[in-house]
Amino acid sequence: TIMSFFYVFFFGMMLSDAAYGAVVAIVCAILVKKYPRMSQSMAKSLKLFFYCGVSTLVWGVLFGGYFGNIVDIVSEKFFGHTVTVPALWFVPLNDPMKLLVYSLLFGTIHLFVGLGIKGYLCLKDGKVVDFICDVVLWFVMLIGLILMLLPSDIFASIAQTTIVFPAALNTAAKVMAAGGAIGIVLMSGRANKNPALRLALGAYDLYNVTGWLSDALSYSRLLALGLATGVIASVINQMGAMLPNNVIGVILFIVIFIVGHVLNLAINLLGAYVHTNRLQFVEFFGKFYEGGGKAFEPFKENTKYVDVKEETTL
């Protein structure tokens, strides 16, 4: 499903170490194979985390992370020359701003998919007007704003690259942003017959564009957790590398390696789990999900009039 794809995608990006991913995938596969009679919910969870482990392995290969930089440390400390396993894409520690840009890009795609699901639900229920006013107009305005942002100096300073659009595209972006904003102001309060209140509700709904900005920036946690995994792993390896090259040093190196990486894996597994859930249930679901059910009505006796009888005791 769409949700599981993004869950696995973001989980792997946050953990982003090939060795950690292999460990998670292997452990989950062994548990599923060894305990076939486990509950269905537990089996589904382990299968999900198996795919999360595979995703982590893929992201780790792309970023060149294998227990942090253990290959570099071991080759230099014990063999006298440095051997580096190159990243297939880039190393986040060397180019964090690039990872930030891609994190925001993936987050924007995730949010747009959520808005698209809202449009699908509107069309499914036959709400064509709602589809146009609550989905299409937002798409038009947001795409226009993004096209205005890309050639700006702000984006150039973050992405460390300059994008130049033709004048016609810049004009079209401004028209899309302005047209979408005007449409939202005029149509968001369409259920209200009072023109002034209708415009006020439309302006309030337009203010929700700041919510879109905060939701998009929330995906910067992909950068933060991805860097945290690699930095902590590298620190653990460096601590082991500070020991002398003798038998005791090797034994302590192995102990530090095992204990340190087990703790790092546990902490970052928890972090990836929590923050991936947050991106799904807060940012993603917030674009289309509407709670159902009925309003709570407590069990009570509803009366309009109350007769009070006064009892007198002699």
What is each of the regions a protein language model found here?
Residues 1-314:
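Conserved, carboxylate-rich catalytic/transport cores that coordinate ions
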